[in-house]
Swiss-Prot record:
Coiled coil: none annotated. Catalyzes the reversible conversion of 2-phosphoglycerate (2-PG) into phosphoenolpyruvate (PEP). It is essential for the degradation of carbohydrates via glycolysis. HAMAP family: Enolase. Pfam families: Enolase_C (PF00113), Enolase_N (PF03952). Binds a second Mg(2+) ion via substrate during catalysis. One of its GO terms (biological process) is glycolytic process. Keywords: Cytoplasm, Glycolysis, Lyase, Magnesium, Metal-binding, Secreted. It catalyses: (2R)-2-phosphoglycerate = phosphoenolpyruvate + H2O. The active site is at E205 (proton donor), K337 (proton acceptor). It is found in: Cytoplasm; Secreted; Cell surface. This is Enolase.
């Protein structure tokens, strides 16, 4: 039995300099698991609640000492002595201890830190790499990365309304080669921006944040960077968008301030369809407001057979909401953010539900990250096929890519890279 003998919670800083929660779990054998949780900038209203202190005189109210105290007191008391290898039972214990629908009492940040740290300790105890502990012998597929090379919206201080413009390397035989492709396109884009006298400062997720005049101009420039790096747009590298449309939906209209447009749901669906016709876009995330289900249905009917339509704020990694979306034919993919739901067991349930319904699942970071690379192991362990973890700069993003390189090396000849087949529900 891998009995838990000690739990230590602490307050650390994330990549934005804001406090977040880290947890150490020590087992009877002396093995330890350590995990740190991320935090988002654009958040869905139905996400599990991360507990913040609210003391304005300390970290602007963003401290997490209350969440840490919960770990070091009642969570510690509840799980002390439990078997770390019984993840589902441990997560159930946390859920019952919290007792709320949205984890608002203990805080999803406290609960997730413990859930992840326990899994890491159990994997160490079993002598298994984390991805293998999660997925068993069937874990051998590396994920296709969506690399956020231009930031807009809530992630950058510029005039772009769409939050993320991503490149998706798909023709490469290995993850290592896909990562190289992404890095080369990133540096080609930097040179193009520099030559134009545009900003090469980066946003929260490591992508550039220049002031383009329109989304079209931004996408056209990315195509130039792909070609400059020696790759073929639409063949070697595809494009993906995260609209984060909930951020610019006001008074029943999609208000693209950067382009001076105010669009209805149908008009915005047409706007996105036009972009998908002009550019090799394979995936669009949060293309409608999280509560605009009629708009989502319109978008899905219009684009759902040829473009991956990812629900992030829409589904918030929640199986109850995902089930409703599947039944209504809304979107065709779910973004998986572990801190949106707050335990590993619930995260894995969302991935499995999506797969059973023929939806894809994209494992994702948050804009406020740490050096913790657990999501890389989840992507491989659960055979998700896709990961979204930022640009080719900032060590908080690169830590996940580097972990995937290590996993691919560890897998050796049995490692596979799915490329375009990761988008298995498109025609």
């Amino acid at each position: 039995m891998s009995a838990i003998v000690d739990i230590i919670g602490r307050e650390i800083l994330d990549s934005r300099g804001n406090p977040t929660v880290e947890c150490d779990v020590l087992l009877e054998s002396g093995t330890m698991g350590r995990a740190a949780v991320p935090s988002g900038a654009s958040t869905g209203s139905r996400e599990a609640i991360e507990l913040r202190d609210g003391e304005t005189g300390r970290y602007g109210g963003k401290g997490v000492l209350k969440a840490v105290e919960h770990i070091n007191t009642e969570i510690s008391e509840a799980i002390m002595g439990l078997d770390a290898s019984e993840q589902a039972f441990l997560d159930k214990t946390l859920l019952e201890l919290d007792g709320t629908d949205n984890k608002s009492r203990l805080g999803a940040n406290a609960m997730l830190a413990v859930s992840m740290a326990v899994a890491k300790a159990a994997a160490e105890e079993a002598g298994l790499p984390l991805y293998r502990y999660f997925g068993g012998s069937g874990a051998m597929q590396l994920p296709v990365p969506m690399m956020n090379i231009v930031n807009g919206g809530a992630h950058a201080n510029n005039s772009l309304d769409i939050q993320e413009f991503m490149i998706v390397p798909v023709s490469q035989p290995t993850f290592r080669e896909a990562l190289r492709c992404g890095a080369e396109v990133f540096h080609a884009l930097k040179k193009i921006l520099s030559d134009r006298g545009m900003s090469t400062a980066v946003g929260d997720e490591g992508g550039f944040a220049p002031n383009f005049g329109s989304n079209d101009e931004c996408l056209s420039t990315i195509l130039q960077a792909i070609e400059k790096a020696g790759y073929r747009a639409g063949e070697d590298v595809l494009l993906a968008l995260d609209c984060a449309a909930s951020e610019f939906y006001h008074d029943g209209k999609y208000q693209l301030a950067g382009e001076g447009l105010q669009l209805s749901s149908t008009e915005f669906a047409d706007y996105l369809a036009n972009l998908a016709d002009k550019f090799p876009i394979v995936s669009i995330e949060d293309g409608m407001h999280e509560s605009d289900w009629a708009g989502w249905k319109t978008l899905t009917d219009k684009l759902g057979k040829k473009v991956q339509l990812v629900g992030d704020d829409l589904f918030v990694t929640n199986t109850r909401i995902l089930k409703e979306g599947i039944e209504k034919g809304i979107a065709n993919s779910i973004l998986i953010k572990i801190n949106q739901i707050g335990t590993l067991t619930e995260t894995f349930a969302a991935i499995e539900m999506a797969k059973r319904a023929g939806y894809t699942a994209v494992i994702s970071h948050r804009s406020g990250e740490t050096e913790d690379s657990t999501i890389a192991d989840i992507a491989v362990g659960l055979n998700a096929g896709q990961i979204k973890t930022g640009s080719l700069s900032r060590s908080d993003r690169i830590s996940k890519y580097n972990q995937l390189l290590r996993i691919e090396e560890d897998l050796g000849d049995i490692a596979s890279y799915p490329g375009k087949s990761a988008f298995y529900n498109l025609r």
